[in-house]
Design a protein with these regions (language model features):
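Short alpha-helices
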Residues: 124-194
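Generic enzyme active-site microenvironment
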Residues: 27, 31, 98, 123-124, ...
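Hydrophobic helix-and-loop "lid/oligomerization" segment in the mid-to-C-terminal part
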Residues: 2-30, 38-71, 78, 84-87, ...
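Active-site cofactor/cluster-binding pocket
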Residues: 77-136
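Glycine-rich, phosphate-binding/catalytic loops in enzymes
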Residues: 43-44, 113-116, 139-140, 193
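Short, hinge-like loop/turn segments at secondary-structure boundaries
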Residues: 72-76, 116, 139-142, 295
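Short glycine/serine/threonine-rich phosphate/pyrophosphate-binding segments
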Residues: 34-40, 104-108
Length: 345
């Protein structure tokens, strides 16, 4: 099966970038999810495999607890905890690999550090409208995940034969999480061929699934139940749903990062629903609301994310951020739903 993504000129550029690099930084977006973390660590494992030993994986902030088992996770450097170390890594880098984000602003507080680096930049991503001021841009929004792209690149670089179980596990985790356990954006035959190739590397797919999706605390499950029971609003005639979550509610249930992961997908189980919106107060920044959108059944939420929520992402899975109160954010969400009422009806 044909997996190659790069033409001859591009693969030559990639080989040169890697062969000439000694100090490599790998970075991903703020609030790194399974795909961001999995692709970054998988790329690190591959680079180790080809003899690159001075690699720094730098994240803007914390990964969810359910990803801490990923092989190599203990090497991740958080900018919000160790800023000087991250700044030093970028300053000394002779190659910066940007994984799973399309715009510099997606690294949040780490943006200035990223942009101050004079090293050539390699972008590997599957989001729409990527920045292109890179030595090489590998952007494929049609792919299921950045992890899928990483697998394809490793294969094209003749790295599959020596791929470790650790690397394969990271790739599988990212592909799995970015497709909701292969329930959406995962209908191409190539995806299941790749899964077969990863299984041949002795990954334990059931264990990976359980570590990610069956890893909630009692408090997390009660928080999720509270939101669905008491906070979820459904506009039946417009096939839309939204909910708000305040800092106080999160504190009541002892919220930790990852407790609400994937919750925005749950309302999509309602028959005929086309749009689900999550509005959550940022626990660290005042008057900041984090927005997640999911869509299905022929409606695409990405334009709404860009128009109303200062965001973007994928056609059916997008995010954004509002600098306002949670009450104001709710009114913006209602306005957005009404704006697209003809498409939602």
């Amino acid at each position: 099966m044909e997996l190659n993504l790069l033409n001859q000129e591009e693969i030559a550029t990639l080989r040169n970038l890697l062969s000439n690099a000694t100090n490599i930084v790998i970075c991903a977006h703020k609030s790194p999810d399974g795909d961001a973390t999995g692709s970054s660590l998988a790329w690190m494992h591959y680079l180790n495999q080809i003899g690159k030993t001075n690699i720094k994986v730098c994240m803007p902030d914390a990964t969810p607890d359910f990803l801490h088992w990923l092989p190599g996770h203990n090497s991740v450097i958080r900018y919000d905890r160790r800023p000087k170390e991250v700044e030093k890594a970028f300053k000394e880098a002779d190659l910066v690999c940007c994984l799973d984000f399309n715009q510099n602003s997606r690294v949040d507080a780490m943006q200035e550090v990223l942009e101050s680096s004079t090293a050539p930049r390699l972008l590997i991503d599957h989001h729409l409208e990527p920045e292109t001021n890179n030595a090489l841009t590998v952007s494929h929004p049609e792919m299921s995940s950045t992890c899928e792209i990483v697998f394809r690149l490793i294969s094209q670089l003749d790295g599959y034969e020596k791929m470790t179980t650790q690397c394969a596990s990271c790739i599988y985790c990212g592909m799995m999480t970015d497709t909701g356990g292969f329930t959406y954006n995962s209908s191409r035959p190539e995806i299941f061929y790749i899964i077969g190739q990863l299984l041949a590397k002795n990954i334990d797919k059931d264990k990976i699934y359980n570590r990610v999706f069956h890893n909630y605390s009692t408090n997390a499950l009660r928080l999720r139940a509270h939101i669905i029971l008491n906070k979820m609003k459904v506009i039946e005639e417009l096939h839309a749903s939204y909910y708000t979550v305040t800092k106080e509610e999160m504190a009541q249930f002892h919220f930790i990062k990852g407790d609400m992961e994937g919750l925005v997908n749950i309302p999509q189980q309602i028959k005929g629903l086309k749009l689900s919106i999550s509005l959550r107060e940022d626990t660290e920044k005042p008057k900041t609301v984090l927005v997640s959108l999911r869509s299905c059944n022929g409606f695409h939420c990405q334009p709404m994310a860009a128009k109303f929520f200062n965001g973007g992402g994928h056609a059916d899975a997008s995010g954004g951020r509002l600098n306002c109160t949670i009450e104001e954010a709710e009114q913006i969400a209602i306005k957005a739903i009404l704006y697209y009422k003809e498409e939602l009806q």
